[in-house]
Amino acid sequence: MMAIRELKVCLLGDTGVGKSSIVCRFVQDHFDHNISPTIGASFMTKTVPCGNELHKFLIWDTAGQERFHSLAPMYYRGSAAAVIVYDITKQDSFHTLKKWVKELKEHGPENIVMAIAGNKCDLSDIREVPLKDAKEYAESIGAIVVETSAKNAINIEELFQGISRQIPPLGPQENGNSGGIKLGNQSLQASRRCC
């Protein structure tokens, strides 16, 4: 029987870059042309095989609007990975991506896997962000970089497979461990002392 690992993943980025569309395409293999902006955050799951394990992605799709920015730490806290999404047709979204990366490095989990998704690659004829720039930036921060199209289902699976490959496998002693706090039995007598 394969071990199932739950991996919390959050999606960050400007409003309108396609975070929700990426999640819908990955989880439901569906694209909605009229998707509404996310309010706060939404949550979906999908389990995929990775080596001798199953990775159950617990995906938090965060709102991109500035007014919801202060909620983001609640979603990336404890995350195994973060997908920072930008729109290849909007240079501003790539600049905002760098702010998200800075915030993750300062306040996120120490060993978080970072993936950069340049979404809307189906619109490459109106591209503002060269892939070369994204690759150089990703390399400078040790992140995965993938250009995606949620609309045309390009590289969506590859994005999450790339994240899976970056997650270290469980060691033999960790199999079956939920990762929670271990409680041990200690003698109460030793701890009962008067001040």
UniProtKB/Swiss-Prot annotation:
CDD domains: Rab5_related (cd01860)
Motif (Switch 2): 63-79
GO annotation (BP), single: regulated exocytosis
Residue span of motif Switch 1: 30-42
Residues binding GTP, per UniProt: G16, G18, K19, S20, S21, D32, H33, T38, G64, N119, D122, A150, K151
Pfam families assigned: Ras
Ranges annotated as biased composition (Polar residues): 184-195
Regulation of activity: Regulated by guanine nucleotide exchange factors (GEFs) including RIN3 and GAPVD1 which promote the exchange of bound GDP for free GTP. Regulated by GTPase activating proteins (GAPs) which increase the GTP hydrolysis activity. Inhibited by GDP dissociation inhibitors (GDIs) which prevent Rab-GDP dissociation.
Molecular-function GO terms, alphabetical: GDP binding; GTP binding; GTPase activity
Record's bilayer topology term: Lipid-anchor
NCBIfam families: small_GTP
Function: The small GTPases Rab are key regulators of intracellular membrane trafficking, from the formation of transport vesicles to their fusion with membranes. Rabs cycle between an inactive GDP-bound form and an active GTP-bound form that is able to recruit to membranes different set of downstream effectors directly responsible for vesicle formation, movement, tethering and fusion. Required for the integrity and for normal function of the Golgi apparatus and the trans-Golgi network. Plays a role in insulin-stimulated translocation of GLUT4 to the cell membrane.
Alphabetized PANTHER family for the sequence: PTHR47978
Description of its domains: Switch 1, switch 2 and the interswitch regions are characteristic of Rab GTPases and mediate the interactions with Rab downstream effectors. The switch regions undergo conformational changes upon nucleotide binding which drive interaction with specific sets of effector proteins, with most effectors only binding to GTP-bound Rab.
Quaternary structure and interacting proteins, as annotated: Interacts with OCRL. Interacts (in GDP-bound form) with RIN3 and GAPVD1, which function as guanine exchange factors (GEF). Interacts with EGFR. Interacts with NGFR. Interacts (in GTP-bound form) with EEA1. Interacts (in GTP-bound form) with APPL2; interaction contributes to or enhances recruitment of APPL2 to the phagosomes; interaction enhances Fc-gamma receptor-mediated phagocytosis through PI3K/Akt signaling in macrophages.
Family, similarity comment: Belongs to the small GTPase superfamily. Rab family.
Name this polypeptide is given: Ras-related protein Rab-31
Name of the coding gene: Rab31
